[in-house]
Amino acid sequence: MEFPEHGVRLLGRLRQQRELGFLCDCTVLVGDARFPAHRAVLAACSVYFHLFYRDQPASSRDTVRLNGDIVTVPAFSRLLDFMYEGRLDLHSLPVEDVLAAASYLHMYDIVKVCKGRLRKKDPDLETRTLGTELPGQTPHPLPSWPPAFCQATPKAKPPSLGVKAVHPLPKFGPPSWQVSEESSGALDLSLKPGPRPEQAHPPCLLQTSQCSSIQQGAQPLVKAEQDSFSEQDSSSPQSADRSPPPVCASAARGLAVNLEPLHIQGTGSQQLGLHAEPVVDSEDLGPGRHLCICPLCCKLFPSTHALQPHLSAHFRERDSVRTRLSPEGAVPTCPLCSKTFSCTYTLKRHERTHSGEKPYTCVQCGKSFQYSHNLSRHAVVHTREKPHACRWCERRFTQSGDLYRHVRKFHYGLVKPLLV
């Protein structure tokens, strides 16, 4: 014999006990706020609390302190009410705060609901999150519960890499993250082969002589990055602390006059050359879209995905002369330190350590770099991208090193099991 109202009645009585402080056996601290609760309810609703009470000794289970930089007091209050009521109230509270708190506590049902709300609230969000995974990695969903807690949980199917639609759904799942700082590397702006979602329109760009005037007349809005590179990547004497604002759609409409359309040959992947100059339709930009500026030649692009192959073409054209072996067939050798190299290109790169040459210069702020990949990493500052996402709290960072330090500071307890 079943009693359908039993679950509702049980939750109601547990809620009354929490409000009265009756039989509450733990206290959750968020900043200066204290939340009395029942361990069994917390562990049943949150993987974070389940792992905490499973791994902590009995003497230290009475108090749980959450990271106040990630979990806000109002957001945790709503999540705690959800645990005892089965209803989630998102009114008068930013969905992003609830999403961050739910991700921190590993409440994946709430994470899914919040992401759905964000998709409905901002349909263009996928254009800003597409391609933000770390190089060489694909996103994969986290399990709803750890294997030790739910042995019979079926394995999640790997995400399909096929093309599903012209505008694919946004990939809100947290990207794979590697603990090693070296493996995370810089943002790779080179064109990668492999399956990619087709775009409704081919990537296109603007070329105009008014680019310099736009930069001179623009008001500074964004503070430039704090230089986290090594000494060999330090800025040249001519450096600016601010970058110009994004070009609005009306300006793009005026810049697109008298430009020739791009003629694309072939039916496979789209190829862009340095001199291909298609017209950017203002309707394609849409409201709130921003143009990206090439840091080498000041050309304008409708998105960072169109900028990537253009930057790659820059570096291929500049370095192609140096990739060949010497015509005499001799082994390339450094005349200063007598080191030998496999080709003249690596020798030229090595010679910069002696000469201090920095041939790659950002046209927006004047900062110079010895290597092209460092300029590519620096370009993210001007495009305002934050491609590196934390898999536990959904916070995003411009540089991979910032993500590494964030994880070491706030999520080290969750990372340690992955290192074993």
Curated annotation (Swiss-Prot):
Molecular function per GO:
DNA binding; DNA-binding transcription factor activity, RNA polymerase II-specific; zinc ion binding
Q: Pfam family of this protein, just one? A: BTB
GO CC terms of this entry: cytoplasm; nucleoplasm; nucleus
Give an example GO biological process. Answer: negative regulation of transcription by RNA polymerase II
Domain BTB: from-to ranges:
24-92
PANTHER family documented for this protein: ZINC FINGER AND BTB DOMAIN-CONTAINING PROTEIN 42, ZINC FINGER PROTEIN
What's this protein's name?
A: Zinc finger and BTB domain-containing protein 42
The organism is Rattus norvegicus (Rat)
* Gene for this chain: Zbtb42
